[in-house]
Each structure stands twice: as structure tokens, then as C-alpha cells.
């Protein structure tokens, strides 16, 4: 049984020290597509965290019974089944958000973070640690998504979660929204800025030259 310190490290490590987007550069495509609004960024975070945590748990529970030759197929089947469940739940209880997320919920099946943790961690680690690792990596992914979504929605549309924060000139206010921030390429610059900030604070994350 893992001790509390080890569980805490597995849970909190991916948020900054080993962030899947900022350090490992995984899951960037969805980060570009779903961060124009905080609402979609939050729902995508919850969806990916649930899929990663539960797929890690189930794969870890049967890891000793999966033949090496078909392990990827088994992992994909478990992940795909969980994604279908998540997608159906979203369509049932948050249909408007599900429409905005479009195909990106389905693409969780091929998300490098989910597949990477299943293969590199869950196949070698007991269920509880694997479950916590899934939650930690989901939270790390979400930390970047929500940070980018905060900047893009606030300064691109003057709102957060659809609630007006900065009064727009077009409605008699003072703020002129920056439309560039609502375009997907802006997320590249924001993610790059976050990576730069994190690696300035933690220089040990900078890759060695040569």
C-alpha cells in the first residue's frame, strides 16, 4: 500500500513539476481547440480527468492478465468505452457544451496523455497509485487549459463563464476585446508563455543542449 507522501507526489507532481502539456508537450491539439471559453475548458478538463483516472484504474487491475501482444488493443478498448460513456453523459446533461466541444471529446481516445499514462504507468503500478496518477495528470492538463481559457475569454471577449467582466465598447463600456485571442493560434503563444514562465521558475526542466 502506497504511503501518503507517495500518493501526494503522484497527485500533485503533474500539475507543475511534470505537467503533461508544459513539460511533456502532450495533448496540445485539444488545448488549442477548447480554450476559447472557460466553460468548455473546464468540461474538457473534467472529461479527460475522468477518462484518464478510470482507464488507469481498470487497466492496472487487469495488467497481470493482459498478454503483451494485445495490450495496446485492450487499453484502447477500455479508453474508448469510457470516452463513449463520458460523451453520452455530456450529451444528456450538458448538451450545449457537448455541441461546442464537438469531436474533441471523442478524440480523448487518441489523446497522448491518456494512452501514455496507461502504457507507461498503469501497466506497471498498483490500482490506487494508477488512479491517483490519472487524476494528477488530468489536473495538470486542466491547469494549463483553464489558465489559457481564462486569458482568452477574459481579454478576447471580456467575460468569464459567459458573464461579462469587462464592459465592451460596443455596449457602451470601455474595453475593446482582442479578437485575436479567440482564434486557435493565440493558444500557441499563451501555452508557450506558460512553458517559459514555468521553466524560468524551475530551470531544471530546461532540456540540456547538445
Curated annotation (Swiss-Prot):
Transmembrane region(s): 14-34, 42-62, 72-92, 103-123, 131-151, 178-198
Q: Which GO BP terms sit in this record?
A: sodium ion transport
Protein topology in the membrane? Multi-pass membrane protein
EC class (word): translocase
- Indicate yes or no for the key word Methyltransferase: no
So which domain of life are we looking at?
Bacteria
Q: What is its EC number?
A: 7.2.1.1
InterPro entries from the entry? NqrD, NqrDE/RnfAE
GO CC aspect terms = plasma membrane
Its keywords, alphabetically, are: Cell inner membrane, Cell membrane, Ion transport, Membrane, NAD, Sodium, Sodium transport, Translocase, Transmembrane, Transmembrane helix, Transport, Ubiquinone
Q: Name one GO molecular function term.
A: oxidoreductase activity, acting on NAD(P)H, quinone or similar compound as acceptor
User: Where in or outside the cell?
Assistant: Cell inner membrane
Could you tell me what reaction this enzyme catalyses?
Answer: a ubiquinone + n Na(+)(in) + NADH + H(+) = a ubiquinol + n Na(+)(out) + NAD(+)
Q: What is the documented function of this protein?
A: NQR complex catalyzes the reduction of ubiquinone-1 to ubiquinol by two successive reactions, coupled with the transport of Na(+) ions from the cytoplasm to the periplasm. NqrA to NqrE are probably involved in the second step, the conversion of ubisemiquinone to ubiquinol.
Family note: Belongs to the NqrDE/RnfAE family.
Subunit structure as annotated in this protein's UniProt entry? Composed of six subunits; NqrA, NqrB, NqrC, NqrD, NqrE and NqrF.
Q: Could you identify this protein by its name?
A: Na(+)-translocating NADH-quinone reductase subunit D
What organism, scientifically named, is this protein from? Shewanella loihica (strain ATCC BAA-1088 / PV-4)
Amino acid at each position: 500500500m502506497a504511503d501518503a507522501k507517495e500518493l501526494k507526489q503522484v497527485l500533485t507532481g503533474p500539475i507543475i513539476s511534470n505537467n503533461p502539456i508544459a513539460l511533456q508537450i502532450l495533448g496540445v491539439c485539444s488545448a488549442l481547440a477548447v480554450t476559447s471559453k472557460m466553460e468548455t475548458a473546464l468540461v474538457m478538463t473534467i472529461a479527460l480527468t475522468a477518462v484518464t483516472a478510470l482507464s488507469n484504474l481498470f487497466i492496472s487491475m487487469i495488467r497481470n492478465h493482459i498478454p503483451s501482444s494485445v495490450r495496446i488493443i485492450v487499453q484502447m478498448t477500455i479508453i474508448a468505452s469510457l470516452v463513449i460513456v463520458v460523451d453520452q453523459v455530456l450529451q444528456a446533461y450538458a448538451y450545449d457544451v457537448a455541441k461546442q466541444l464537438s469531436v474533441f471529446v471523442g478524440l480523448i481516445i487518441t489523446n497522448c496523455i491518456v494512452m501514455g499514462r496507461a502504457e507507461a504507468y498503469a501497466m506497471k503500478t498498483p490500482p490506487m497509485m494508477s488512479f491517483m496518477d490519472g487524476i494528477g495528470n488530468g489536473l495538470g492538463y486542466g491547469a494549463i487549459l483553464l489558465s489559457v481559457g481564462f486569458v482568452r475569454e477574459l481579454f478576447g471577449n471580456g467575460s468569464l463563464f459567459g458573464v461579462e467582466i469587462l464592459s465592451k465598447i460596443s455596449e457602451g463600456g470601455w474595453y475593446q476585446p482582442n479578437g485575436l485571442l479567440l482564434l486557435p493560434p493565440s493558444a500557441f503563444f499563451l501555452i508557450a508563455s506558460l512553458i517559459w514562465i514555468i521553466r524560468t521558475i524551475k530551470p531544471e526542466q530546461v532540456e540540456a543542449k547538445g
